[in-house]
Every structure is written in C-alpha cells, then in structure tokens.
Amino acid sequence: MEPVDPNREPWNHPGSQPKTACTNCYCKKCCYHCQVCFLQKGLGISYGRKKRRQRRSAPPGSKTHQDLIPKQPLSQTQRKPTGPEESKKEVESKAEPDRFD
C-alpha cells in the first residue's frame, strides 16, 4: 500500500477514486466498483432528486372502471333491536347449572 501524502487532499489520495468511470451496468463487478456504485446499485440507496413518474393515461376509446358500475341506491341494513333483558334470558336458558358443586 502506498504511503499517504499529508499535503494532498483526502479525495486525491491514491485509491480514493477508481481508475475507470462508473457505468449504468448492474452486474456484480460493477456493483462493487466503488462506494458510490455499491450504495446506488448494490443497496439501492440514492440521495439525488427523484424523478416524478407520470401516470399512463388511458386510451381515448376506453371506458374507466367507474362507468362500468351501475348507479344503485345504497340499501339500509335492518337490525333487530335487542335489549339487555332479551340477551340475559337467552344466556340463562342456554347455560346449564354446575353439576360439580
């Protein structure tokens, strides 16, 4: 290993920058090319600005999924009003007395 020159900046030390440029390839060799390639390609971490993906618009002749649903009124669910007396009676009738006493 070469000795580090104290007069040089850290980014100019030998071995701090790879001899070849970074590529867009995602093979194993290119993923371990340098620290930046490892973070971006190997781990999938990038700190740059994210590009906004545009949604693909539907072709003009196609119908949206909302047009296919027929308009129907929502039905109200009917519930039987049960009071506390009814539920207690049902529980008492279903329960058996303890035979182990």
UniProtKB/Swiss-Prot annotation:
N6-acetyllysine found at: 28, 50-51
Residues flagged as site, Essential for Tat translocation through the endosomal membrane: 11
Residues binding Zn(2+) 1, per UniProt: 22, 33-34, 37
GO BP term, pick one: symbiont-mediated perturbation of host chromatin organization
Pfam families: Tat
Positions of Zn(2+) 2 binding: 25, 27, 30
UniProt-annotated stretches for the region Core: 38-48
A single cellular component GO annotation: extracellular region
Record PTM text: Asymmetrical arginine methylation by host PRMT6 seems to diminish the transactivation capacity of Tat and affects the interaction with host CCNT1.
First and last residue of the signal peptide: none
Region (Interaction with the host capping enzyme RNGTT) residue spans: 49-86
UniProt key word Secreted: yes
Note: HIV-1 lineages are divided in three main groups, M (for Major), O (for Outlier), and N (for New, or Non-M, Non-O). The vast majority of strains found worldwide belong to the group M. Group O seems to be endemic to and largely confined to Cameroon and neighboring countries in West Central Africa, where these viruses represent a small minority of HIV-1 strains. The group N is represented by a limited number of isolates from Cameroonian persons. The group M is further subdivided in 9 clades or subtypes (A to D, F to H, J and K).
Protein name (record): Protein Tat
Native organism: Human immunodeficiency virus type 1 group M subtype J (isolate SE9280) (HIV-1)
